[in-house]
Amino acid sequence: MSVWTTANNSGLETPTKSPITSSVPRAARSSAVITTGNHQQHHFQHVVAAAVAAATSVATGHQFQQQFPLHAHPHPQHHSNSPTGSGSNSNNSAGFQRTSISNSLLQFPPPPPPSSQNQAKPRGHHRTASSSMSQSGEDLHSPTYLSWRKLQLSRAKLKASSKTSALLSGFAMVAMVEVQLDHDTNVPPGMLIAFAICTTLLVAVHMLALMISTCILPNIETVCNLHSISLVHESPHERLHWYIETAWAFSTLLGLILFLLEIAILCWVKFYDLSPPAAWSACVVLIPVMIIFMAFAIHFYRSLVSHKYEVTVSGIRELEMLKEQMEQDHLEHHNNIRNNGMNYGASGDIV
């Protein structure tokens, strides 16, 4: 008769003949064969289970072994060629289990530590990042960004005032120099006095606006050309706000009104000796133009003030909503901390 025994610890079995002597009695031989068969069947089941576990661990750990290659030291395998020894079979199966377990442990290395990117960031990090990104437009209602917007508006006003004032004052000076008056003119003396006063006021107002623009604009241009919101406090536009508004009003409102009056008086002085109706016609045409100009100026300034008021109101509402949200978040955070403290105290972690 033949029984199955292990030839090595890799799970390969080879049938070997069990020698049976004729000197042993038949009953003893049958009991020995039954005992040996039971031991061999138990050993065969154990070896098959260990082989299946090793194959499963090798299949599942193949990907981890590619990512984390570990060079394990080979373990010496002990071969046993004993045909019937149960003790040697137990030792071989135990050695096979230890080798399989050690190989499976080497194939599954410990997971890497969590990276610093996945770790929790402190509470002040988000606030600092949001405040440092004001230049990109993410914090549009911060005091620094609002000051930067005022800086840009003041810069535009000063540029417009300087150009307008230089142009109109130059025209007034040329008109006063080029006008030709004779001693025997029929122009009323009052009209000549009005012409002199209007021309002087026109040049003085535009020169004042031009002086303010010329003095303040370089300091503002220096900060604007740096393109950095963090340097906005170095600009004098906040302290010199009233001077900038004065230059803007002198150049666009008062200066233009005086320029229209200058045209009417100049037409009267120039054409009165030649044709009095021509002088009166110039004044008649200029009256509706002056009315339209004044109406447009009033409407424009009212619209501008209304727009500023709406923007200010919307900004205040957003600030109120932001304040309420911050208070609600702070209250929720405080409640969570208190609840966690009560839970820890109840569990006995904190006494």
Curated annotation (Swiss-Prot):
It catalyses: Ca(2+)(in) = Ca(2+)(out). Residues 1-163, 213-248, 299-351 are cytoplasmic. GO terms for molecular function: calcium channel activity; calcium channel regulator activity; identical protein binding; store-operated calcium channel activity. Changing E262Q: Impairs store-operated Ca(2+) influx. It is found in: Cell membrane. Residues 182-191, 270-277 are extracellular. Pore-forming subunit of inward rectifying Ca(2+) release-activated Ca(2+) (CRAC) channels. Assembles in hexameric CRAC channels that mediate Ca(2+) influx upon depletion of endoplasmic reticulum Ca(2+) store and channel activation by Ca(2+) sensor Stim, a process known as store-operated Ca(2+) entry (SOCE). Regulates transcription factor NFAT nuclear import. This is Calcium release-activated calcium channel protein 1. It comes from Drosophila melanogaster. The gene is Orai.
